[in-house]
Design a protein with these regions (language model features):
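Class I SAM-dependent methyltransferase SAM/SAH-binding core
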Residues: 11-68
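A short acidic, Gly/Pro-enriched loop at the edge of an enzyme's catalytic core
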Residues: 68-77
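A short, conserved alpha-helix within the catalytic core of class I
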Residues: 85-100
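Conserved class I S-adenosyl-L-methionine
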Residues: 110-136
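Short alpha-helix
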Residues: 147-165
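Conserved S-adenosyl-L-methionine
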Residues: 166-177
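C-terminal helical/coil "lid" or tail adjacent to the Rossmann-like core of SAM-dependent
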Residues: 175-221
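Core SAM-dependent methyltransferase catalytic element
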Residues: 227-244
């Protein structure tokens, strides 16, 4: 999707271990990585390790702040599973994120996401299991006073890109086969939330359900086919030319208005 375009200056708008490990391996002039979590910032710095240069930055900040990276533009901007994660840090802000980032995109914008799988009716047994894991995870997060991620479909992102002033260059979809790591990581997240519950009976019931779900899912995840369910997508976009931001105003023919009536002179 990048082709022969240079990476130039690079912004990882919602960084994590995997994304920054990849970004720091690219031939960039400089990069900035933003996260709202201090813990994730430490993890990201470890991912960059010795490849962290003096011109590179890891920032702990929230994109709801208008001062963040004010006046800076980047040749390449990456949103790596970022829109789905916004709910945990800036709920109800998803529709504004692309407009917020638009001034920082000089060249190419890449958006990576997952098609939602928690709400839609699954068509296969593997899909049912993946959905059950997602619903159990979200239920435990809510009971533990957390906020579940909220994935958005590619169709929603494409509409928002147009509204925010971007032209879509390419869309690719990649079918997902979930493996053992996914099952265990999601269910371990569930277990961590149980410490927040004040109801021991409910916590034990959920713990039993978590382990039953693990026992059901792992044979599928360990098989050659894995848990085939849904797809990831990658969208490449770029800013519209300034002349394309709005349609030209219609040309109106001037109309001669009749003169205003004059007041009659007082008689007498």
């Amino acid at each position: 999707m990048q082709g022969s375009l240079p990476w130039g200056s690079f912004l990882d708008a919602g960084t994590g271990y995997n994304s920054l490990r990849w970004v720091s391996s690219l031939d960039t002039e400089r990069w900035a990585a933003v996260t709202a979590s201090a813990g994730m910032a430490r993890t990201a710095r470890k991912a960059a390790a010795e490849r962290l240069r003096s011109q590179d930055r890891v920032l702990v900040a929230n994109w709801t702040s208008p001062e963040l990276l004010y006046g800076e533009c980047f040749d390449t901007v990456l949103l790596d599973y970022f829109i789905g994660a916004i709910e945990g840090f800036a709920p109800y802000w998803q529709e504004q994120v692309l407009t917020r980032l638009r001034p920082h995109v000089k060249g190419r914008l890449y958006i990576v996401g997952t098609e939602p799988y928690v709400l839609d009716a699954p068509a296969t047994e593997e899909g049912r299991i993946v959905q059950a894991i997602g619903r159990l995870r979200d239920a435990c997060l809510l009971l533990g006073n957390g906020r579940p991620y909220r994935e958005y479909p590619a169709s929603w992102v494409l509409r928002q890109l147009g509204t925010a002033g971007f032209r879509v260059r390419e869309v690719r979809r990649f079918p997902i086969r979930y493996r053992e790591r996914f099952v265990n990581s999601q269910l371990e997240m569930c277990l961590k939330q149980l410490d927040q519950l004040n109801d021991p009976a409910l916590a034990q019931a959920l713990r039993d359900r978590i382990e039953a779900q693990r026992a059901e899912a792992l044979p599928y995840a360990r098989s050659e086919q894995g848990l085939a369910c849904g797809a990831d997508y990658v969208i490449a976009a770029e800013p519209l030319d300034p002349g394309h931001h709005a349609l030209p105003l219609p040309q109106h023919v001037p109309v001669d208005h009749p003169p205003a009536p004059q007041e009659a002179a007082p008689s007498g």
